[in-house]
Swiss-Prot record:
One of its GO terms (cellular component) is cytoplasm. Its main location: cytoplasm. Its EC number is 2.3.1.274. Signal peptide: none annotated. It is found in: Cytoplasm. Belongs to the PlsX family. It comes from the Bacteria. This is Phosphate acyltransferase. NCBIfam families: PRK13846.1. Catalyzes the reversible formation of acyl-phosphate (acyl-PO(4)) from acyl-[acyl-carrier-protein] (acyl-ACP). This enzyme utilizes acyl-ACP as fatty acyl donor, but not acyl-CoA. Pathway: Lipid metabolism; phospholipid metabolism.
Length: 321
């Protein structure tokens, strides 16, 4: 199937041309595969820069009146009705796109997406879901920044979404998956009152599939397939993990074998998925460089082609008990 993907050129910490270069690399790498139709959203000054590129013949460019900056408040972002982010989400909502990718302001993207894109029925709150490499493959962790403070019911919703996501990508419909609650210790009594209540609810709902509390170090061991956490803790965990990998890559350099670098390179995974929406929205890190943008865009294509949001909706209904 042809995938129609929208990309927000604006709002990240990088130059918009970095996104443009990543798009070119994705198009080159996908030669011979099923076609991909890109639509990019950029301000007029960036649009003029892109028109001289040979790539402009292969990519549709939509001119935006403005863009959402990292410094914009939510109110300011919402008021920018013709921003690159808003226009991209409008096109997604209208069915003109199969997915939308942005590396802009996270809070603005989540808020605008939630206001424009219908939620999957029975999902209490959206969450940012990201894949992280482990010794046994990969795990998904959510939430990593959509909502700072959540209640136990919402955490259970995250668990169901994470399970539905893993199930939707599995070729084996009966494959078992395990869950863990990110906490300051593995003992049941650890954590806040909210964590303790969430622990009890997850144990009652998921039974033996819930392996209890896990500490940050357990995530990379592959002990569990789905890690449940609130957006504040999850975001701190994710940025710490990314920073540690970058530190090791810088310190060890060429002494790290390529296969090891690839195994623990978070940039080869898609960006964070705003899970819970009925349409695909991917948030790339604002500081994403070319490789991470390539991974985010390529991953978005794969997820759109797999119709992952519809499959999550189907699976989510099965997981509500």
């Amino acid at each position: 199937m042809k995938v129609r993907l929208g990309v927000d050129m604006m709002g990240g910490d990088h130059d918009p041309l970095v996104v443009w270069e990543a798009l070119g690399e994705v198009l080159l790498s996908s030669t011979g595969e099923q076609p991909v139709e890109f639509t990019v959203f950029a301000t007029s000054d960036v649009h003029h820069q892109l028109m001289n590129s040979p790539l402009s013949r292969s990519v549709r460019i939509v001119t935006a009146e403005d863009f959402v900056s990292m410094e914009d408040s939510l109110l300011a972002a919402v008021r920018k009705k013709r921003s690159s982010m808003a226009l991209g989400l409008d096109a997604l909502q209208q069915g003109d796109l199969d997915g939308f990718v942005s590396s802009g302001n996270t809070a603005a993207l989540v808020t605008l997406a939630r206001s424009k894109i219908p939620m999957i029925p029975a999902v209490p709150r959206p969450a940012l879901l990201v894949s992280v490499p482990t010794l046994s493959g990969f795990a998904v962790i959510l939430d990593v920044g959509a909502t700072v403070s959540v209640n136990p019911d919402e955490m259970v919703g995250f668990a169901r979404m994470g399970l539905a996501y893993r199930q939707s990508l599995s070729s084996n419909s009966n494959q078992p998956f395990t869950l863990g609650l990110l906490n300051i210790g593995s003992e049941e009594r650890k954590g806040t009152d909210s964590h303790k209540q969430t622990f009890r609810m997850l144990r009652n709902i998921f039974g033996s599939a819930f392996l209890g509390n896990i500490e940050s170090g357990d995530v990379f061991s592959g002990k569990v397939d789905i890690v449940v956490t609130d957006g504040f803790t999850g975001n701190v965990f994710l940025k710490t993990a990314e920073g540690l990998f970058d530190f090791l890559r810088h310190i060890l350099g060429d002494r790290l074998e390529k296969s090891i670098k690839m195994q623990f390179d978070y940039t080869i995974y898609p960006g964070s998925i705003i899970s819970g929406l009925s349409r695909l929205v991917i948030k790339c890190h604002g500081k994403s460089h070319g490789t991470a943008l390539f991974g985010g865009i390529s991953g978005a294509i794969d997820l759109a082609r797999a119709n992952v949001c519809s499959r999550i909706a189907d699976r989510f209904g099965d997981n509500v008990v």
